[in-house]
């Protein structure tokens, strides 16, 4: 499954790695009435008792380079058996994984970087330079840090640290690819990045990962955030910027293909798909 589109003059494509089955809503969106969460999900046409999300990987053709942003779960099935489709969908779209020049990571959680390495220990994108935040690499590269979750730490050891010589760290506001600027958006992880793309779009990563709950309840502490209070503040900053600057949203976990915009709605926000 893939979807071609343009961001200004930049050719883009969304490529699916397939859906994930996450925890029950009240276990993720903390401090929100479970009944309110269920009602919001039902109103959105989603199942009320489980968080189901997509994995929409962005491919850009920019400045003679082919850049892939995040790469899904790989072959791991801890969030269900329907993920791990990225490589097959790339080939269906006519994209050879060996043609990827830049592998760009919003952060190092399982569903964003476990497609980096194959089960045999060889890179799935053998010619790619890996770009990620310096703060993210420092955080996950520090063994024994009690703030790390064990599953993500194991994944970093398998998928990223063996390729350390290919990793280039990037900083907030750095334009590291033609038409692409990094935006440090901490909270979900210490070095989480969003990306601003010339032509008026923002790849938001996991700052506001769920449509509609992240928009209706931006102040809710998220169980997946390393620093939940920082995550709340970052989410408010991001959502206000998306609205004020009228940026198009590229949502990694949003309903396929994850494209739309954000508007203010009552005392919170809402995502308008396809706009």
Task: Report the location of each language-model feature.
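Cap/insert and terminal regions of metallo-dependent hydrolase folds
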Residues: 80, 198-275
């Amino acid at each position: 499954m893939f979807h071609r589109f343009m961001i200004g003059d930049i050719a883009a494509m969304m490529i699916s790695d397939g859906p994930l089955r996450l925890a029950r809503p009240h276990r993720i969106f903390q401090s929100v009435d479970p009944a309110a969460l269920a009602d919001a999900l039902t109103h959105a046409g989603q199942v009320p008792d489980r968080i189901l999300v997509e994995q929409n990987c962005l491919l850009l053709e920019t400045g003679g380079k082919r850049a892939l942003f995040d790469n899904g779960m790989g072959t791991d099935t801890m969030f269900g058996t329907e993920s791990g489709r990225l490589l097959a969908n790339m080939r269906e779209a006519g994209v050879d994984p060996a043609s990827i020049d830049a592998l760009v990571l919003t952060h190092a959680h399982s569903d964003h970087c476990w497609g980096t390495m194959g089960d045999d220990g060889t890179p799935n994108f053998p010619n790619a330079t890996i770009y990620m935040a310096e703060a993210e690499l420092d955080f996950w590269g520090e063994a024994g840090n009690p703030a790390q979750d064990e599953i993500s730490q194991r994944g970093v050891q398998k998928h990223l640290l063996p390729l350390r010589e290919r990793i280039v760290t990037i900083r907030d506001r750095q334009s590291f690819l033609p038409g692409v600027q990094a935006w440090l958006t901490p909270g979900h992880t210490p070095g989480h990045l969003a990306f601003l793309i010339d032509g008026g779009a923002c790849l938001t990563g996991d700052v506001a990962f769920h449509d509609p709950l992240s928009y209706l309840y931006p102040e809710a502490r998220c169980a997946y955030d390393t620093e939940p209070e920082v995550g709340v503040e970052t989410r408010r900053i991001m959502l206000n910027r998306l609205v004020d600057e009228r940026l198009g949203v590229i949502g990694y976990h949003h309903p396929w293909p994850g494209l739309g915009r954000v508007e203010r709605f009552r005392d919170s926000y809402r995502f308008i798909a396809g706009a």
